Amino acid sequence: MKKLLILGTVVTISAFLASCSNKSQTATDESSSTVVSSSSSQETNSTSSAVSEAKKQETQIIGSNEYGFVKVPKSWVRFHEVEGGNDIQYCDGTDINIVTLNTFKAEQFNISEEEYAKLDVVTVSSSILTSKEQSSDFSKVWGSKSTIGGYEAYVVNAIAKSGKYLVTWVFRSNDGKIRYVSLEGDGETLKTILPMVESSWSNTKVE
């Protein structure tokens, strides 16, 4: 599903850029949601160094220098979509709870590096939101804003007809790259994994 959504985003943005439209697009709704909230509201102080160390041992750092890194439970395993694709994806052993990392590149949008540097992140997130709104897989789609790895992100939230949640962060990191991070799963899993992803994302591997 992620491969098709990312591909749809690339196609939509390419068409948008080809039209030479510079109209500002706003695809975010800053109202609070039960699915997505900023990391600052999710994080809590460690009760002891022992508890912190125990939690550290229960997680692993996944990702790459190209796509960035996040923490996930140590029990999660890497998998590859049957349709192919270059995403980095980990799951809990089911096809329900999944985290995906990727980075948008200039060539995907058929634009120059100079144009990529000026590309508005809102445009990218708007395209993702639109592709989900047009998909028959989702019963509800909305936008919000949050923070991931210290960066302001435009977040696209969706609820699948199966009841599964999908949260997608789109943001530009300090190296100029436009990042894509998504988390999908059931509500209970997201309560734990969402703040973990938001607080741990980094473009370098931090042990």
What are the roles of these predicted feature ranges?
Residues F69-K118:
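Secretory pathway targeting signatures of secreted, lumenal, and periplasmic proteins
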Residues I6, N22-P73:
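N-terminal, intrinsically disordered, polar/charged segments of Gram-positive cell-envelope systems
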Residues A54-I61, G84-I88, T147-N157:
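Short, hydrophobic/aromatic-rich segments at coil-to-beta transitions
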Residues M1-L4:
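Positively charged n-region of N-terminal signal peptides that target proteins for export
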Residues S125-F171:
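Signature of long, low-cysteine stretches enriched in small and polar/charged residues
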Residues F16-S19:
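C-terminal motif of bacterial Sec signal peptides marking the signal peptidase cleavage site
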Residues K177-E207:
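Surface-exposed amphipathic alpha-helical segments
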Residues I6-S14:
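Hydrophobic helical h-region of N-terminal Sec-dependent signal peptides
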